[in-house]
A protein has these predicted regions:
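Active-site cofactor/cluster-binding pocket
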Residues: 2-5, 13-157
Length: 157
């Protein structure tokens, strides 16, 4: 029988002592395609926040992840979080593991939100369909629309 690992408990002692805990909920959206580590990154971030004493809620969509499909994870961190889903247009941070996914999800970012995007281009299997056009200029479009954008060559990290 396979043992399953349970999520860490919220560290309530830290939560009470830490004066830096925000009174508001921080909304982080991690997006990419299957196999990039979106689910692992969201799990690590959630566990670290729990251990730091925050309340954390997380929701994932990974239906076609094994076939290079879209993968997304909503992570909400705060003193008390009631829902795992980030309200539309209210992401404080979007961490995009792929350029086109950054462009696909940019409407979920707050006007003063911050986008971190990997400079990687992964053309999905659907690109073989002549109706699909991969946005070659995704970074230029994002740069023109956002004040807070950081492009990272994650393969070098």
């Amino acid at each position: 029988m396979k043992k399953t690992k349970s999520a860490p408990e919220r560290n309530t002692k830290t939560a009470k002592k830490n004066p830096h805990h925000a009174d508001r909920t921080i909304n982080i959206l991690i997006v990419g395609v299957g196999g990039q580590g979106v689910l692992l990154a969201s799990q690590i971030l959630s566990e670290v926040a729990l251990l730091a004493g925050y309340d954390v809620k997380k929701s994932e969509v990974h239906g076609m992840s094994q076939r290079g499909g879209v993968v997304s994870s909503h992570i909400r961190i705060g003193r008390k979080v009631y829902s795992p889903l980030i309200p539309s247009g209210q992401a404080d941070v979007i961490l995009a593991f792929e350029r086109a996914e950054a462009l696909r999800w940019i409407h979920e970012l707050k006007p003063d939100g911050f986008l971190i995007v990997n400079d990687q281009q992964l053309v999905p299997p659907i690109a073989g369909d002549k109706k699909y056009v991969y946005p070659e200029n995704a970074l230029e479009i994002l740069s023109a629309r956002l004040k807070s954008l950081r492009v990272v060559d994650a393969a070098r990290i």
